[in-house]
Amino acid sequence: MSAAFGIKADAATHPGRMPLASLAWDARPARAGVVVLVLHGGAIDGRQPNRVWSHNVIRMLPFARALAKVPGPIAVARLRMRYRGWNGDEASPLLDTRWALQQLRADYPGRPIALVGHSMGGRVALHLGDEPDVRLVLGLSPWIAKGDPRPGAGRRTVLIHGDRDVICPLWGSRHTVDELLAQGREAALIRVARSDHAMLLRAGLWTKLVTEVVQVAFADELGGGAGDAGRDGPGPHDPAATPVDRVDAVVQTAVQRGGILDL
C-alpha cells in the first residue's frame, strides 16, 4: 500500500517482476451511496508500464479530485493499469479493471458503481458495463472498435466527445448511442464543440460535465437534490440560457431522457 496522488493505493499481486495494477482512492468513506472507478486512456498496443506520472494517468486526476468533492456519500478510486496498451486478444486493461471492480465490491458490497473512462478507458467501461453493480458507463472521447460489446438493460450510458477529436472520431460515439437508443437502452451523447481528444480544450467544461452526470444519475444515492437541478430552468437548446444553465439542462436531458445533445 502506498500513496499515489490519492488517499492510498492498493496493488494487484502478479508473479515475478511484472508491472502491477494499482488502485488509488481519492475518497474512501466508511459508507458510500455510490462508488466511482476512474479509468485512464492508453494505446492500441504497448507493454510499457503505466507510471503514476504517466500523462495518460495524470490526465484523469482532476476528474477524480472533482468527483471526490461531490456532496454526499461517494467513494472515488483511480485504476492505474499495468500496461500502456490494449494488446489485442489479451485485452490487458479488462483483466486489470475486473480486479479493481472486485476490490470495490469487497469494500462496498451491493453499492452502485459508475465507470468513468477516457479513450481506452472508455472502451474498457463499455466492455464491462454489464459487470455486477455497474449502473453508469460514462465514456470520455471513448475508443470504440467494431464489434465491441454494449452495456445491456439496467445500465445508463453517457458518452461525451469533442468535435475536434482526430484520435477517436466522434462518429464512433454517435453510432454507439444511436444503436443503444434503437435497442431501447438508456443512452446519450454530449458533443463538446471546439474540443479535442485529450480534453484540454474547454477542460473545465469536461470536468463539470463528469461531476454533474454522476450527481444527476445517482441523486437518490447521494441524498441530495441533484436530480432536480435545472429541471425547471431553460432547456438545452434555449439561446437565452446562461452557459451554466445550458450545462445543467444538457446533463438533465442526457441522464433522464437520453439522445444527442450539443454544448
Language model: regions and residue ranges:
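Alpha/beta-hydrolase active-site loop
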Residues: 87-107
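Short, surface-exposed "cap/lid" segments of acyl-processing enzymes
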Residues: 4-71
